[in-house]
Amino acid sequence: MARPADSRPYGGAVPLPPRPVPARRPRRVVSLVPSLTEAVAVTAPGLLVGATDWCSHPADLAVTRVGGTKNPDVPAITALAPDLVIANEEENRVPDLDALRAAGLPVLVTEVRSLPEAFRELERVLVDGCGLARPGWLDAAESAWRSLRERPRRRAVVPVWRRPWMALGRDTFAGDLLARLGVDHVYAGHAERYPRIDLAELPPADLVVLPDEPYRFTADDGPEAFPGLPAALVSGRHLTWYGPSLAEAPAVLGAALR
């Protein structure tokens, strides 16, 4: 997940373009979404031929790098001759996806704002898009999230960026995960998805949740800005990625939020 932008290139009043399902199983896939890169690589090693510079998992991923999520190298992607390009409406920009389509490449655009949407889109990408069998890790992830115990509810500030300060707002995947873990973020009703916030005017909260991505908050960089609030440092990958890490996310995040 790169630095957040409060935009929805394929949402709102603009309808999603057709979501292609290939007539045959793709043999060459390029992923422009770190979460989905990991999902495809773990499920079908060798299927991916290209991924962004931000695609850090699996650690041993050996594919051609094609630039960033917000500035992919369209000629480099085209040169790889992929059967399918996987994208996301929040991670990637409309002009880049339009350029890929103009080059004749099929682009599958995902839309994930909640855990149920993540599970649905993962199956669509892997099974419908890539022609793969439903992976066991996806079943394990769904089971892990179904098995959550009820927790006392707490209110939290959840920054995602510093300089300027930005936080989780409405309609976010990370916010949905936290809510399922008993944490209600204080800007959930904000008009923006990633609003800028004034630390001098914070709503009442029980804690501050500080992920290590997209901004890398640490014990020495973040908690000091919220005196009097307990700080929970959490794995940004487990909070914001929708892929194999979802199977362990309830345990990892739950432990950090205690």
Pin down the residues of each PLM region.
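N-terminal ligand-binding lobe of clamshell/alpha-beta domains
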Residues: 2-258
